[in-house]
Regions:
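N-terminal secretory signal peptides that target proteins for export/translocation
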Residues: 1-4
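Sec-dependent N-terminal signal peptides of Gram-positive bacterial secreted proteins and lipoproteins
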Residues: 6-29
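Primary recognition of N-terminal secretory signal peptides and signal-anchoring hydrophobic helices
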Residues: 24-183
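Catalytic-core signature of thiol
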Residues: 173-446, 451-482, 503, 521-528
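Short proline/glycine- and polar residue-rich coil/turn motifs
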Residues: 481-488, 500
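Exposed aromatic-hydrophobic patches
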Residues: 489-497
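Noncatalytic modules at the cell exterior or secretory-pathway interfaces
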Residues: 498-512
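Short, surface-exposed beta-strand/loop patches at domain edges
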Residues: 511-570
Length: 570
């Protein structure tokens, strides 16, 4: 008994001592306690673990180039050796680093022409062929990959400071003036490639291009083949493999969670399609890049995935002759005025690709490296070059930037299966819109999803709890604000989750501002044969110019509002 008491009080004293240590500022040579400094070498290993756990209790704030970065999926960690581990998923958008390779034990990062290779089995990293000693450059914890902050310092020139007092990591890019994009980049070079597909004698290039772009965005972490058949036939539109389509149908299908479905579950050109197959991913964000913004297109390919774009061509899968195509150099450039009629995927670029390789005169060198859906017999095993100066390449551009596991939310509330068909507004760049939904179970509202119909769109999000009629809009509660750089579909995670009671109505309200727009609200309606099956009695949507007087759009406009809610069950 006496020994147990001694052990108990000894444990209490050690814990109290460590807590006191943590309360003082960590110095470079150790932890200061009054006038005494306990060096790292003299600290027991148990202390290091306790200290690390203490730092990780509170979320570590990340500031990069004086801007706070929001971490949604995972937080920064401090390990027992005070290594600062940053979740890998933020590297493309936060640090402009591309993942050329990614698996459970190794990662290849690229920024500009600098390439860094990290491996969990090595006590060093390789930067442009040179080894730099570094313990724990890469770790995996709770199915999340983390990269040591030292990698950013040693490989890409970042300076950083961790404030113990504020629990804050500040990082500064000392190489801001350097171009993040190399002069040439291609998924073929980085081995981030899929097998070339063949649409055959159908008009489904739009679906092949959409899903190929999506598949490359899922890579290099995962390699999966997705069902074109399901996208074409299960998207809410009146559609067959020969009817054609465009990226808006693809976005509607994916953001409605009807797909993407595995190719193994719904094979291409099968006579029937499977409505029961579950999506293998949930698509939460799709960006539409500004027309002819070549640098932003390259950046999207570099950081996220292939960019779906379009061409005009008189060629097809069977007839590959054209005055605009050089069969010997696999180079294409159309300089006429006809609108696009074929979708492809941009998977790279070469700024120095000679203009002499094209069969028509072009302004200068430079070409996108593109992937077609006419089988490996076309071009260079299915790939070809399209001049930067082609009339249509880069006019319509789509990249999938928000791809999450299919268990991210439990429920989706929506009334716009066909997605963004048209737009509403009040001849102004600003408007309010809302959808009202009845909670099926006791749930928490965690996120909302809606379209930005053009670039630089800003928004305010509000919620109305226990909605009954339009008078309930007087009780709107402000949640948060934000801005989108590009047009597209976006999911916004709410900073304040809302508890929802089964059977009660809840309204999400968006105030949107899209510069130079006159109709900034995306809507679904029956615009023709393809959308004739649009259902209006599944939604309760409203619009307002000022937020004071509201109009029920299903009744007055014959349309649905494109505004979704995402919830989790309690």
């Amino acid at each position: 008994m006496r020994n147990k008491k001694i052990f108990f009080w000894r444990t209490v004293c050690i814990i109290a001592f460590v807590v006191v240590l943590i309360s003082f500022k960590t110095q470079s040579e150790g932890i200061a306690l009054g006038s005494i400094t306990v060096s790292e070498d003299d600290r027991p290993a148990q202390w290091q673990n306790i200290i690390a756990k203490e730092f990780n209790i509170d979320r570590i704030k990340l500031i990069v180039d004086n801007k706070e970065i929001q971490l949604n999926k995972a937080d920064i960690l401090i390990d027992e050796n005070k290594n600062i581990m940053i979740p890998a998923y933020i590297f493309p958008d936060t640090f402009n680093c591309a993942f050329n390779a990614f698996d459970d034990t190794s990662v290849t990062l690229q920024k500009g022409n600098i390439i860094a290779i990290l491996d969990t089995n090595n006590s060093y990293i390789t930067v442009d062929g040179q080894s730099i000693t570094m313990d724990k450059a890469l770790v995996k914890k709770n199915d999340m990959t983390y990269i040591n902050a030292l990698v950013l310092k040693e490989a890409f020139g970042y300076q950083y400071n961790w404030s113990v007092t504020d629990n804050k990591l500040e990082m500064i890019n000392n190489k801001k003036s350097e171009n993040i994009l190399p002069h040439r980049y291609s998924y073929r070079d980085t081995k981030r490639m899929l097998s070339i597909k063949n649409q055959g004698n159908t008009s489904s290039c739009w679906a092949f291009a959409s899903l190929t772009a999506l598949e490359t965005s899922i890579m290099p972490a995962q390699n999966t083949e997705l069902s074109v058949n399901n996208m074409v036939c299960n998207n809410g539109y009146v559609n067959t493999l020969n009817d054609g389509g465009d990226y808006t149908r693809a976005i509607a299908y994916l953001t409605a969670w009807r797909g993407p479905v595995s190719e193994a579950d719904d094979i291409y050109c099968d006579s029937i399609y499977d409505v029961s197959s579950n999506p293998v991913k949930h698509i939460q964000e799709v960006q539409i890049i500004e027309s002819k913004n070549l640098e932003e297109i390259k950046k999207a390919v570099f950081l996220h995935g292939g960019v779906e774009s379009s061409l005009y061509t008189s060629m097809n899968e069977h007839d590959r002759s054209s005055i605009y195509y050089n069969n010997e150099t696999y180079a294409y450039c159309y300089n006429g005025t006809k609108k696009p009629n074929h979708d492809i995927v941009i998977i790279g670029w070469d700024d120095n690709y000679p203009k002499s390789n094209f069969s028509v005169d072009t302004e200068a060198d430079g070409a996108f490296i593109c992937m077609n859906s006419w089988g490996s017999g076309f071009g260079d095993e299915g790939f070809f070059y399209v001049s930067y100066y082609d009339t249509n390449i880069g006019v319509h551009n789509v990249v999938y930037t928000g791809i999450e596991d299919a268990n991210n939310y439990d429920n989706i509330y929506q009334s716009d299966i066909c997605g963004w068909v048209g737009q509403l507004g009040y001849e102004s760049d600003t408007a309010f819109f809302s959808n009202v939904y009845t909670a099926s179970e006791n749930e928490t509202l965690q996120a909302v999803g809606f379209y930005a119909t053009d670039k630089n769109t800003s928004y305010d999000i509000y919620v109305v709890e226990n909605f009954s009629d339009v008078s309930s809009f007087e009780q709107i509660k402000y949640i948060q604000s934000g801005e989108f750089k590009n047009a597209g579909y976006y999911t916004v995670n709410l900073k304040q989750e809302i508890d929802m009671e089964a059977g009660k109505k809840y309204a999400v309200v968006i105030k949107i501002k899209t510069p130079d727009a006159v109709h900034p609200i995306a809507i679904e309606y029956a615009a023709g044969k393809a959308t004739k099956n649009v259902i209006l009695d599944d939604g309760e949507g409203y619009i307002s110019y000022t937020g004071n007087s509201w109009e029920h759009v299903e009744e007055s406009k014959g349309c649905n509002i494109c505004l979704k809610m995402y919830t989790k069950n309690m």
